[in-house]
Amino acid sequence: AKADPEDILIAIHVSNRGPETARLDLLPTVWFRNTWSWDGGTERPRLAVAGGHPAAIAISESTYGDRWLHCEGRPTLMFTENETNAARLFGVTSGPRYSKDAFHRYLIDGEHDAVNPEQIGTKAAARYQLSVPPGRTVTVRLRLNDKRPGLGALAEKDFDGLIAARRREADEFYQTILPRSLSDDAARVARQALAGVLWSKQYYHYVVSDWLWGDPAQPSPPDDRRRGRNHQWTHLYNADVVSMPDKWEYPWYAAWDLAFHCVPLALVDPEFAKEQLVLLLREWYMHPNGQLPAYEWALDDVNPPVHAWAALRVYKIEEKRRGIGDRAFLERVFQKLLLNFTWWVNRKDAEGMNVFQGGFLGLDNIGVFDRSAPLPAGGHLEQSDGTSWMAMYSLNMLAIATELARENPAYEDVASKFWEHFLNIAHAMSGGRLHGGEGHDLWDEGDGFFYDVLHAPDGTRTPLRVRSLVGLIPLLAVQTLEPEALEQMEGFSRRMRWFVEHRPDLTGNVACMRTPGHRERRLLAILDPDRLRRVLRVMLDEQEFLSPYGIRAISAIHRDHPYRLNVNGTEYRVTYEPAESSTGLFGGNSNWRGPVWFPINYLLIEALQRFHHYHGDGFTVECPTGSGQMMTLGQVAT
């Protein structure tokens, strides 16, 4: 909690839930980010025992001035350097005398000479040796501020009173954020989730040119690094506070993770959410060709294009809460996403036929092969999810253009562009089925499901019949057009009517273009009512995708019936794996072969709601499949 912008109060509560007294060492730690080891020109900051105050750490840095960490009681203060233990890691004799692993070595290995006896360094900890009785809680208080040590810094009454006041203020704030319909338990879960995403902000510093050529004060990297990964991203200069998937296990941004983060962030900090979405589109992130950086390990990889969706959701959330939307933000994002959309069309459509690839697309090991690597037999994958993401992207851009056209008619032309893109993609996914089209049908009529298709060098095409989210993502490409918007956009409406009349080969592959639905809405979707029912029959089957906790990433039928494919004498296999991954793909700690992934479930809920907005209460499906219980799509979504 903060007393003021320069005064941070820290209370650490240690609870013993067991039946016996427990002893432990608690080490609140303060350190400087290492900025001095790389270019040789940066002054080293300093931590030391505050003179005359053995329970306070003096913090000195040339740019930011002096601070102090006040520690309750009489802990043992330990100091070392925030530098790598080169001897242990690289087996060299040179390196710092005191290294960042010193506290572990001191406590666990008994190496008392691992810490600096002069009590100075760039990393420090206050060691508390605690004994906590069963069922009791011990509290340790610290305070970080710009005030010299003295009496009263940790006075318990004032300290605890201020934290209690900040807690009340936080309670009042979240009462304005969370729906009143939530139970107390659900509200706590929501607050914990929002706290988690706020806590995962991190300063992220990655300069590709520095990484390729090395730091001035360090040994030069091998020459092949300059021809390796990320060598085409020399413009990338990241030095910003960024929302991370997790500051410990995943301390780097991923393009689509960040977009998803921004939607809940918009509830508590809409300005930060907007800044994050704009940041990834700036010139020092986005490639000059329009590609968004995927993540640091391989900036060239491709995440699903959900940036437009997230920007519109953030815009709508702020508009609902404040009564007015930030149109300047929406326009900034839209203008830059035009570049990204064009990159997708030019780079990820191998045959120029509106059937897209994209590689792993964030779904890691969901495929038969590593979809980011060359295929074992050559050729390419026509991806159901890649194509569907682009259909959704087209509709998201159409929705943004429609919103902006309310005040600027110039956006009507751009709305028409994205509407026509969507028509072409929907046409391609169905193989132009109404007019005898061939060659690109990702829909399997027999199974009532969408699959990736392996397109071999000899022209043969093999559907990869894995029941996975790859076949459900076509559901996400859905948008309704309100009659009021169509009336206002006269030019767009004329163009739409012309297409319906003169290009039935295209409009016939889009759900319900000719027929107004509930409240005269128009529907743009890949799935017509028949295909919608067939896909939902699979998705809502408890033996397949529907679990007690959401929609699985892969159908449970693959538990007993793995998918197998033989290519050049090698068998490839996909099995339902609801827990840990059995493959080493993408580090081995990422599993898309069974677990429920919340962001995709969120998008599926949103898609069902949109279908319901068009079809209304007259359209029902069996949920769960085989139960005899009929529900509207709105009921299924909830």
Annotated model-derived regions:
Residues 1-638:
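Acidic, mature catalytic/reactive cores of soluble proteins
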